[in-house]
A protein has these predicted regions:
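Regulatory and interdomain segments flanking nucleotide-handling catalytic cores
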Residues: 1-154
Length: 154
């Protein structure tokens, strides 16, 4: 599962974006959400999705807006699922919390985490698929390249 936690940047000095952000995400991703997008901690929104394509699209949308620090947590969630995202828990939610905290210190305001963290020893053979660190690096490159585009480039 993929948990996206987005924390509004400079929320004390900006308009409240969490309510409209939640509503916009809910409308845009209707039918692709495991649970409804929820507002958490006042200035945060959180979403739970089951597929990587939706998670990536949501990360790209939120970071493009420029108003959010975005954490992507990947892992399992505790079942049975509650009715509200803010009531759900599990390793993916813990990872998303760690990721959004790291995102606040990132130039792209994005970070990815898994729980438990996965690491490869130097002597391990490379896996067939990229690990979390490689995926985060690729997304960071994508975000940096995208941020250099002019409005006319869109």
């Amino acid at each position: 599962m993929f948990v996206i936690t987005a924390d509004q940047k400079a929320s004390r000095h900006d308009i409240d974006r969490a309510g409209s952000g939640r509503d916009d995400l809910a409308a845009r991703y209707e039918g692709r959400l495991v649970l409804p997008v929820d507002r958490t901690s006042g200035d945060e929104v959180q979403a739970l999705v089951a597929d990587a394509a939706t998670a990536l699209d949501m990360v790209l949308l939120l970071t493009r807006a420029g108003h959010w620090s975005v954490g992507l947590g990947i892992g399992t969630v505790r079942t049975p699922l509650p009715r509200a995202t803010r009531e759900a828990t599990g390793p993916a939610f813990i990872a998303a919390r760690d990721a959004v905290t790291a995102a606040k210190r990132s130039a792209t305001r994005f970070a990815l985490a898994t729980d438990p963290p996965t690491a490869r020893a130097d002597d391990d053979p490379p896996p067939a698929l990229p690990g979390p660190a490689e995926v985060e690096a690729l997304l960071t490159l994508l975000l940096l390249a995208r941020d250099r585009r002019t409005p006319q480039g869109w």
